[in-house]
Amino acid sequence: MNKKLIIPITICAIIIIAVISTCLGKSSKIKLIWETVPAPKEIKDSIELKVYVENSGSMDAYMCAGSNLKDVVFDYVSDLKRLTTSCSLYYINSEVIPFTGNLNTYIKNLTPQSYAKAGGNCTNTDLRQIFDTILKANSKQTVSVFISDCILDIPQNAIDFLGNCQISIKNTFNEALAVNPELGVEIIKLESKFKGFWFCGHNREFLDDVKRPYYIWVIGNQRYLAEFNQKVPVENIIGGIKGYCAYATPQKIPFDISKSTYVTNRSGKIHVELLVNLRGSLQSNNIYKNIAQYKSANPQQVVVTSVEDITATGITYSHIIILDFSN
């Protein structure tokens, strides 16, 4: 018999494998036929890195002595900088303020005093405007890194404001996706030492010797982000991360199978190792290895039993998906 098995992977796209099952006496031979999707080649494009740190009043307290934020930004941007052809540094609030020095000087100048001198409206932050500004300056060969506590300046009509803000930011990203359908977005949640005023709308409170969350947004072509993640893993950010989520458009999954013909065991099953490159989906390894994320169009015949990392160097694939085929 000749069947086609469609194995949708919910975090990516689909893999289609044709299965031919032939009876050979008491045993059966199963032959798999597939069209390999090649793994992406190493990127040779010229990539422009743009780094934006929000210089608002709510960010001042992160710039205290012993700030984890400054160390993380310095280390992470230094690593990304090696993978790009240029790096531009900015402050951002109501306007974009270019920084003319190098990365070392930029980090040293992450202080409340420098924030105030840089200009713009440091009192109120409109994230809708910030994302609109960043995305409109984000060409197809640009990767933007935005560092912020992402606190909204909420007016009295909070419910109406939050709904409007959510829709506005969604529309901004949808417009960017229309221009660049391969746009990917990563949001990394971290914590830093915090000493100063915490703002919420018109209220504020002085906090001392506490840790507060902040976020790094990485925005750019998902192929670029996938290569960044391979060479500069998000999980290795100094101090560890507190959370991670990402968006990438559906795509073909690069995959191959080591052999095509199998003889079934006594239970009538075969075990197939599927070599796949899942990096382009930008998801965390916890999601990659969660078999609940994988769906078979014919679960009576094909089951995903496990997903394992490929740790060997020089391999273009990221994971091995183990499939059980029933004859």
Each language-model region and where it sits:
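Von Willebrand factor
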Residues: 41-148, 152-153, 184-187, 191
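Eukaryote-biased recognition of electropositive, low-complexity segments
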Residues: 180-302
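Extracytoplasmic/secreted cell-surface and envelope-processing proteins
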Residues: 59-63, 97-102, 152-162, 195-200, ...
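Acidic, polar low-complexity linker/tail segments
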Residues: 3-50, 55-63
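Extended, charged low-complexity segments
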Residues: 283-327
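A charged, solvent-exposed segment within the mature domains of Sec-exported extracytoplasmic proteins
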Residues: 134-207
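Well-ordered, non-membrane alpha-helical segments in soluble/globular domains
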Residues: 65-76, 113-132, 157-177
